[in-house]
């Protein structure tokens, strides 16, 4: 089987530069949160930091695919390798290969906007869906057309790839190969398609962000002393400094992280009901802390 590598230098460099830039922005947001008087602006800095960290993690997670990408050919199949992913395309199903420059008219493509980042999905009026596994621009890409799926690839030695493809295509297959897609175990985890889990985690996170926003937004105008405890008659029997408004935030953050981790742990053990219970309880806990801040900060 002949293997044709991609040129991963540009996407890898672009990814590293992007990660450094994003982390620099996150660090600047952290400094802004530290040196700005506590207010809703502080919450915005925190939110920006979290979003930038999530973006950096996403970019880093894509780099192995660009670094470890190649296309292998024999008389029976074309194997597209992208990180731990394998797309095995039977040679018998390939109808033809064309230059990607022939498809520029009407092509729509969703990809991450970094140089050399051509992993994504597109659509063309004549061919339908296109699956991009490329590290170079359209001028260097090759489209592999089959009845069901179309692949866009960019071997570094495009001419050598086409010569090898044509030679093997003319020889015809020696055995029947079925299309298959081999994914790393984590990519086939049921969690990624579990909308109920996504819904619960999203609501737990939003409830916690609401808790932080409420505390930081109320702090500047809160009195110097705020009620911390009420007796059975509803009368305040203990006061404390207004910095105590952040106690529910701290406890809520710890419980949020523990709840997410515990839920993922039991979910991985195929106990989805228990994971739902943990995450649903997490939503209720965060809502309870919101009520707590309202009671002590607005009393």
Regions found by a protein language model. Give the residues of each.
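Non-transmembrane, membrane-adjacent beta-strand/coil modules in membrane-associated proteins
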Residues: 1-5, 81-150, 239-240
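Transmembrane alpha-helical segments of integral membrane proteins
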Residues: 28-30, 253-269
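Hydrophobic alpha-helical transmembrane segments
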Residues: 37-52, 237-242
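N-terminal membrane-targeting/pre-transmembrane regions
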Residues: 1-41, 132-135, 139-168, 172-194
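Conserved beta-hairpin
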Residues: 56-103, 230, 235
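Juxtamembrane boundary at the C-terminal end of a transmembrane helix
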Residues: 289-299
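Active-site and channel-lining beta-strand-loop segments
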Residues: 217-245
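Cytoplasmic juxtamembrane regions at transmembrane-helix boundaries
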Residues: 263-285
């Amino acid at each position: 089987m002949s293997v044709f590598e991609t040129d991963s230098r540009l996407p890898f460099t672009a990814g590293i530069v992007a990660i450094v830039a994003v982390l620099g922005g996150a660090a600047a947001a952290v400094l802004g949160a530290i040196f700005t008087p506590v207010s809703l602006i502080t919450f915005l800095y925190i939110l920006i930091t979290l979003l930038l960290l999530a973006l950096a993690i996403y970019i880093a997670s894509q780099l192995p695919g660009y670094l470890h990408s190649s296309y292998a050919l024999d008389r029976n199949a074309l194997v597209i390798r992208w990180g731990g992913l394998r797309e095995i395309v039977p040679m018998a199903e390939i109808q033809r290969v064309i230059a990607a420059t022939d498809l520029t008219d009407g092509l729509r493509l969703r990809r991450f906007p970094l140089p050399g980042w051509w992993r994504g999905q597109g659509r063309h009026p004549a061919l339908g869906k296109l699956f991009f596994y490329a590290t170079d621009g359209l001028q260097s890409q090759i489209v592999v057309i089959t009845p069901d799926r179309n692949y866009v690839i960019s071997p570094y030695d495009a001419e050598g790839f086409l010569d090898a493809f044509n030679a093997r295509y003319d020889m015809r297959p020696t055995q029947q190969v079925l299309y298959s897609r081999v994914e790393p175990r984590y990519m086939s985890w049921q969690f990624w398609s579990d909308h109920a889990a996504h819904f619960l985690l999203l609501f737990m996170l939003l409830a916690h962000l609401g808790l932080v926003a409420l505390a930081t937004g109320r702090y500047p105008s809160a009195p110097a002393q705020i009620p911390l405890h009420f007796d059975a008659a509803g009368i305040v029997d203990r006061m404390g400094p207004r910095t105590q408004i952040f106690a529910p935030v701290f406890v809520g953050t710890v419980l949020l992280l523990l709840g997410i981790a515990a839920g993922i742990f039991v979910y991985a053990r195929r106990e989805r009901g228990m994971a739902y219970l943990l995450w649903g309880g997490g939503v209720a806990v965060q809502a309870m802390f919101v009520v707590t801040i309202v009671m002590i900060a607005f009393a």
